[in-house]
């Protein structure tokens, strides 16, 4: 399996959780939370991470409804992801992100790092979970 530089994104209306992976493409790590303001500012903040980490692919969590359909938020996420692809010329890979925020909260609570006032930590951890799922799927697909 060839190493990949991927950036995981948990895109919400107010914040974007950001995660990166190690040089081998095996382990995802939470990086930061971007407070959304304008499209230009959001793109500039993401551009910083793309340049700093030499990103080759953007992995975006897609918030399917529990019945598997694409709701309003999922369509907004896809629209923003298309803007990312156009702005940076990078491929977009989608990951089903149902319940990743709940999983992120539970992990942070177990680590005694959860604070209701710091929702950005949940977004970062959700982005990490999204990216880790993608990395693991990629690893399984490359095995004979």
Curated annotation (Swiss-Prot):
GO process terms (BP): rRNA 5'-end processing
HAMAP family: Nuclease_YqgF
Biological function: Could be a nuclease involved in processing of the 5'-end of pre-16S rRNA.
Native organism: Picosynechococcus sp. (strain ATCC 27264 / PCC 7002 / PR-6)
Any one Pfam family match given in the protein's UniProt record, by short name: RuvX
Keywords, in A-Z order: Cytoplasm, Hydrolase, Nuclease, Ribosome biogenesis
Source organism superkingdom: Bacteria
Transmembrane segments: none
GO CC annotation, single: cytosol
CDD domains: YqgF
EC number, as in UniProt: 3.1.-.-
Location, primary (coarse class): cytoplasm
Protein family per UniProt: Belongs to the YqgF nuclease family.
A single MF term (Gene Ontology): nuclease activity
Cell compartment(s), UniProt: Cytoplasm
Protein name stated in the entry: Putative pre-16S rRNA nuclease
